[in-house]
Amino acid sequence: NLQRLDGPVRGNGKIIQELEGDFRGAGWNVIKLVWGGYWDPLLAADKEGILRKVMEDSVDGEYQAYKAHDGKFVRDYFFGKHPKLLEMVARMSDEDIWRLNRGGHDPHKVYAAFDSASKHVGRPTVILAKTIKGYGMGQVGQAKNPTHQQKKLDIDSIREFRDRFAIPIPDDQLEKVPYFKPAEDSPEMKYLHERRKALGGYLPRRRQKADEHLTVPKLDVFKAVLDPTAEGREISTTQSFVRVLNQILRDKEIGPRVVPILVDESRTFGMEGLFRQIGIYTPDGQKYTPVDKDQVMYYREAADGQLLQEGINEAGGMSSWIAAATSYSTNNRIMVPFYIYYSMFGFQRIGDLCWAAGDMLARGFLLGGTAGR
């Protein structure tokens, strides 16, 4: 909608074209939903491309202003940029010009864009839809910078809003600003219920506990780790954990549910043995022969690998951890993720995601490995 909280996002540029470049560069299919259907006759009449050029040359700060004023303002400051454009709209009233809509507010164009996106195969699709912040709020808030601070509308603005969107609430109830809910047997409600059932149920829905139960290994499985060494030699906590993890991975029930996650630090923690034991997950398998293939603990990638190797990407590692740690709720399938990171690169890089994980009731293990001394 061109606006952030304080002002336009790219007042001197064009955010849609900027985002288009980002997505196309990443290999996405991009659908731009910029102009509504009322522009179609004008674009069809634009034989010399003048209208298209003015559209392209106008920056977002100008587009915000057009929808914060009225039809006369648009006539003077948009179509007024070229005499032939003024000729083009000479027979249109200011109201007609004001009715020229943005693509994101045209139901037909929105449908066409979504239909095209749903039929596209081979690449993900993004729809960049142009809309107006505060759409329908009229002079109180439409396309205005303080729109997000607007806490309430006066009665005239509420009436204007009701009329604008044809909400069936009588005048004598407007002061209470009641919610409108269609009747249960209305086409709208029937459609909403049908869609929710087709999609697997109602939202929001939170599964507190998975329906399945996993048997925890008995303590004597970890005897080799818990018993003191014959020489009374101390071992590092990192080494102890690696031994515990190895035992858990061997368990027939819990083992397949374990998700070890590392961010380019496996060798740092002495965990490279897992490369050979469980493999590094990659959807397409290993398409090359690793340089250390002749070694016992070589870098083995596999389509059925279990270890997630995220590279130097703590945010990615934590995101994978959250996905596995909330699987009991979202997928009704318990997973046991272990995210092991270099201690000094831990919460410093993923603090916000830890907070989010707590809000989501994520269940798993975060381990700060070597302290870096």
Would you name each region that the model predicts?
Residues 2-228:
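Long, well-ordered, tryptophan-enriched scaffold segments
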